[in-house]
Amino acid sequence: MDRAQKEKVVEELGQIFESSGVVVVAHYTGLTVSEMQDLRARARDAGGSVRVAKNRLAKIALEGKPCESMSDLLTGMTVLTYSEDPVAAAKVAEDFAKENKKFEILGGAMGENALDRAGVEAVSKMPSREELIASIVGCIGAPASNIAGAIGAPASNIASILSTIEEKAEAA
């Protein structure tokens, strides 16, 4: 790799570190090509990406970034799993690590916050952005349906009372 290519890689990695909601660093020693392709496909499906980069270039790209403390994790054969959604990459990495013992999560960063192994696991258990939006919409919609039910209740109560009176009259 010549100097221009290295500078381009450093620039790309810098953009990744700035724009990603979460970056997970893991060792991937011993993974087969098909296993790496599976990891990439899972990350892509979740809206994330996977990148293998030289540790030295990644450390240069981290200089001056909010997640600079993550540079200590960049030793050995490392892979970066990242996404704009702060939860997606962590979930993909955790799920993949459970199935592949050769994939060892070291930690990562979420914005300015450095994450250790337990931190990545905790982030992976959080609801995704879509799940949070769905629950907020559900909370907003619930009062409206309750009001509609309360407005319709007197009419249904009257109908129920009238049908009971009618049944009693027919029985007598």
From Swiss-Prot:
Gene3D superfamilies: 3.30.70.1730, 6.10.250.290. PROSITE patterns: RIBOSOMAL_L10. GO terms for cellular component: large ribosomal subunit. GO terms for molecular function: large ribosomal subunit rRNA binding; structural constituent of ribosome. One of its GO terms (biological process) is translation. The keyword Transmembrane does not apply. InterPro entries: Ribosomal_uL10 (IPR001790), Ribosomal_uL10-like_sf (IPR043141), Ribosomal_uL10_bac (IPR022973), Ribosomal_uL10_bac_type (IPR047865), Ribosomal_uL10_CS_bac (IPR002363). It holds the Pfam family Ribosomal_L10. Keywords: Ribonucleoprotein, Ribosomal protein, RNA-binding, rRNA-binding. It comes from the Bacteria. Forms part of the ribosomal stalk, playing a central role in the interaction of the ribosome with GTP-bound translation factors. Part of the ribosomal stalk of the 50S ribosomal subunit. The N-terminus interacts with L11 and the large rRNA to form the base of the stalk. The C-terminus forms an elongated spine to which L12 dimers bind in a sequential fashion forming a multimeric L10(L12)X complex. Belongs to the universal ribosomal protein uL10 family. NCBIfam families: PRK00099.1-1. This is Large ribosomal subunit protein uL10.
